[in-house]
């Protein structure tokens, strides 16, 4: 196993990756988006072509570019807009629950539990 790969396997947090690659970052951005940044970095790595034949120096340079881009994505956008994780892809901002349906649901639960009924306001 090459030296770069061995060193990368020892890293676990977004902060560690950014520091390893010498990428300046704002802690508030990383704190909120750490998993999103790493997931996006992973996505960029899998889409990148020609990484297999690179030496450690060139691979470090390419990985650094991809991680910097992943971080940058979240300095100018949000996790919801970037939709890195499936939960954001599926939601697509369309979730809607009416107050009436919540009231009806709660009334049914109370009724089945033997509690007092709710009255509509």
UniProtKB/Swiss-Prot annotation:
Which gene specifies this protein's sequence?
Answer: nifW
- Biological role: May protect the nitrogenase Fe-Mo protein from oxidative damage.
**Organism the protein comes from:** Leptothrix cholodnii (strain ATCC 51168 / LMG 8142 / SP-6)
Question: What is the annotated quaternary arrangement, including any partners?
Answer: Homotrimer; associates with NifD.
Q: What is this protein called?
A: Nitrogenase-stabilizing/protective protein NifW
Fetch the Pfam families from UniProt.
Answer: NifW (PF03206)
- Belongs to which family? Belongs to the NifW family.
| Superkingdom field | Bacteria
Q: Name one GO biological process term.
A: nitrogen fixation
InterPro entries linked to this entry? NifW (IPR004893)
Its keywords, alphabetically, are: Nitrogen fixation
